[in-house]
Amino acid sequence: MTIFTKIAKGEIPSYKVAENEEFYAFLDINPLAKGHTLVIPKNVEDDYIFHLDEKTYEGLWAFARKVATAIKAAVPCQRVGVAVLGMEVPHTHIHLIPLQTEGDMDFKKKRPDFTPEQQAETAAAILKEYEKL
């Protein structure tokens, strides 16, 4: 069982921003920007997005699109960037990152520090927007 599966099952706490029967979205604990969110399939632990079956693959992207719409409404940004790396955690996941510039997607840059209170507030704002969709 991966750490992301444990998060989706509620065994490890997270800042949830969206959820449905098949997918879960939560704030990254080491974000590149305010609102940096990870989107995962709940029941598939493969670490390579292109190994997903067609239904899960399409569903994951549709869910990510809805979450990105909520992020854009809740977090001031020019757009929401997308990255699929799959290098650190062996569980398919999509990064949704609020951007002002292309440089905001630099995974090697110094990352901002957010307090637990700030993360909780951001997650609640995104979840509120998600629930409107």
Language-model features and meaning:
Residues 1-133:
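HIT superfamily nucleotide-processing domains
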